[in-house]
Amino acid sequence: MDKSIGVIDSGVGGLTVVHELMRQLPKEQLIYLGDTARCPYGPRSKEEVRQFTWEMVDFLLTKNIKMLVVACNTATAFTLKDLKEQLDIPVIGVIQPGARAAIKSTTNNQVGVIGTEGTISSGAYSQALEKIKSDIQVSGLACPPFVPMVERGVLSGPEAKAVVSEALRPFSNNKEMDTLILGCTHYPLLKSTIQEVMGEEVTVISSSEETARETSTLLDVHQIMNRSDLVPLHQFYTTGDLEIFIEIAKTIFQESHFQMLTIKQANISTNKVW
């Protein structure tokens, strides 16, 4: 079997990217690591996020990966440049693909972005969007309650609706916004509720599909696409509660996909300072 693609996230959110990678690249073998024990990354300092991200990368490098997908917006905002400079394998984040998808979607240049405190305060989405289209109008909103709620497995129902409605209240009077970027890979797990609260006139963008498409392009450019016809066996690791991780994974993946997975607990703590 060919080498695997490594995927990292602060928790279960990156599984939404993995799901799309499995759909678009069915021959590729994936190794996923979710740092659920230290989730969320959003309120943490840049230094902490950088340390935790490099610890995850270090773990995956021992698995001899051929490419890295940073399926965490906060980690992408704070560490992508360093990762690209220091690793000798292709690296992709989720912010640029999400920005490109939003530019394709908007008809009036009014784009909203929701994400963690870290992602929104970094201005990474505004910079990415404005680099593509200088006259874009970007409104950012941090939604701190979303990630902890998703990590508890609350993905729909009255609690999810109440939390999402309250968090998105600042956007309720913005009648011009026609596109909303889910600037955290946890948020697609709440997409139906977010769409309901925002209304059908707003296009809700998840970067997962675009990230998978750009991953495919990078594999092709670097000539590392898996050509084997063997059925891939994906490896998932979590630093946190294994049972909760498995239950959330079951809501994302079909039974046929689930039979192609092994899910284990990982200890990635290290004394090394990155």
From Swiss-Prot:
It is an enzyme of class 5 (isomerase). GO terms for biological process: cell wall organization; peptidoglycan biosynthetic process; regulation of cell shape. The keyword Cell inner membrane does not apply. Keywords: Cell shape, Cell wall biogenesis/degradation, Isomerase, Peptidoglycan synthesis. PROSITE patterns: ASP_GLU_RACEMASE_1, ASP_GLU_RACEMASE_2. Provides the (R)-glutamate required for cell wall biosynthesis. This is Glutamate racemase.
